[in-house]
Amino acid sequence: MSKRTLEGTTRKQKRTSGFRARMRSVNGRKVIKARRKRGRYRLSV
């Protein structure tokens, strides 16, 4: 048996697509705004 290849890291995930990371840039804010408008239950990771 070979091991699974893609095993994600929570820290990396939070740093790239977490709420604080999104709020840091203008485009990230746009993402949050769009997700709010659409009524998403989860705005970010």
Swiss-Prot record:
The keyword Plastid does not apply. Gene3D superfamilies: 1.10.287.3980. Pfam families: Ribosomal_L34 (PF00468). It comes from the Bacteria. Keywords: Ribonucleoprotein, Ribosomal protein. InterPro entries: Ribosomal_bL34. GO terms for molecular function: structural constituent of ribosome. GO terms for cellular component: ribonucleoprotein complex; ribosome. One of its GO terms (biological process) is translation. Belongs to the bacterial ribosomal protein bL34 family. This is Large ribosomal subunit protein bL34.
